[in-house]
Amino acid sequence: MPPPNVNRMARYLAILFTLGAGLVGCSEAPDTPSPASPTAQPPAPTTAQLSPGGAQPRLAADPVRLAQDLIADERALRDASTPEAVLKQAARRQQVAYRAIGRHPEWDAIIRPVLPAELIPFYDRNVDARRQLAKLAEPRDTLPAWRINPPPPAQALLTAYRDAEAASGVGWNYLAAINLIETHFGSVTGDSAAGAQGPMQFMPSTFAAYGKGGDIHSPRDSILAAGNYLAANGFAHNPDHALFRYNNADAYVRAVTDYAAAMAADPAAFGVFYRWDVYYVTTAGDVLLPVGYAAESPIPVGEYLTAHPQ
């Protein structure tokens, strides 16, 4: 049995995102439909920008109003006529809304009943994923020594996921979900405390065994290696076991399953997640790390927030 690829970036972090922080679990994970082709228009390439500063989108304080705004954003994200700039802003607000709802289970009885039926599965999977990731988050008093770059083009990622699926039998949506949680599709550049590297956060020794001579920092090579690793750990017969071997946390397994199910069922989901921001969980709350963020060493969170108010 291959050695588990543990102590990935999310452990060190307290991150992300999708994330906002972390990783996931296994109780009553939703059934995942057969992977559907992501037919929505792939997002336009992301361009680096530090202004308007990475300030977080503002949400309504009232959960009823928040629900109304979330419905409007969800509909815009599924409307083929929505301009890219509007899609980006809707996705950013949606992400922050799910992060807030994840922290407030008392809002469930207010928000969920007013959602249109067609949005409930996507809502449920996102809220559950957030709560699972929160179990793995350890708020830090410093921001990480990372760089945040634009992710690779969406179509290049989708091609890599599909090629890995064809080679390994592991669903493209599971590979995309792991890529989302680990490094926001490769936006995050930085090693974990344990030494995990690259867009799929492999330990070098594990990548050497499953990467077939590829480059651990290559998005395509690391995605293909992840498919090989999961297949070798019995993904075809027991996906939960294989995902647990990838990162030894039940909450991680459940979050990956949630995001994978969302992408399999909803053609808009991948584009939505691709447009999300990178967040880091700190003792001062969630901090948005914009494209262009770069630190050679950890930065005290208070110092960063003074210069970059959220």
Predicted regions and their residues:
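Sec-dependent N-terminal signal peptides
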Residues: 13-19
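C-terminal motif of bacterial Sec signal peptides marking the signal peptidase cleavage site
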Residues: 23-25
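Short, low-complexity, disordered segments immediately C-terminal to signal peptides
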Residues: 27-47
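Bacterial N-terminal signal peptides that target proteins for export
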Residues: 2-13
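Catalytic glycan-binding domains that act on GlcNAc-containing polysaccharides
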Residues: 106-290, 306
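Intrinsic disorder/low-complexity detector
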Residues: 12, 43-49, 53
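Extended, helix-rich structural scaffolds rather than catalytic motifs
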Residues: 295-310
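N-terminal export signals and maturation junctions of secreted/periplasmic proteins
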Residues: 29, 50, 54-158
